[in-house]
């Protein structure tokens, strides 16, 4: 079940366990996080890319908490809804916002993930990737 794989990945991300995250993604994995006013982010690739992402998060945010409220399989993807609470290391910026993820699992590993500011945007992206279903 793809949702179980993604749920395990999210638990590892919440723990900031780079080795566990790297072990769960495919070699050609691509992760597209959101850029914020605290930091611009590009695409992170593969297991080493996710280790770098977690280091970048730690360098940017004094506190970074992800809460997951729902995980659902949709059109060959896994949608996740939740909330991010983060406090910048460099400024007084506090982010307390809803967040949604779209993930794709292939061959038992997570092959793609992208972060969105809303569930609607994540659903729309999944439908576009799936050919409009």
Residue ranges and their predicted role:
Residues 19-20, 26-75:
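A solvent-exposed, acidic/Ser-Thr-rich amphipathic alpha-helical stretch
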Residues 18, 32, 85-89:
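Short beta-turn/strand-loop junction motif enriched in small, turn-promoting residues
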Residues 1-27, 124-133:
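Short, low-complexity N-terminal intrinsically disordered segments enriched in polar/charged residues
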């Amino acid at each position: 079940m793809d949702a179980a794989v993604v749920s395990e990945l999210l638990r590892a991300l919440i723990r900031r366990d780079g080795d566990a995250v790297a072990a769960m993604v495919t070699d050609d994995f691509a992760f597209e996080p959101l850029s914020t006013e605290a930091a611009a982010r590009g695409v992170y690739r593969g297991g080493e890319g996710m280790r770098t992402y977690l280091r970048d998060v730690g360098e940017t945010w004094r506190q970074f908490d992800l809460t997951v409220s729902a995980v659902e399989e949709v059109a060959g993807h896994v949608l996740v809804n939740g909330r991010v609470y983060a406090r910048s290391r460099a400024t007084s910026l506090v982010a307390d916002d809803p967040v949604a993820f779209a993930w794709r699992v292939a061959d038992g590993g997570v092959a793609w993930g992208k972060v969105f500011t809303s569930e609607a945007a994540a659903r729309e992206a999944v439908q576009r990737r799936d050919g409009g279903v």
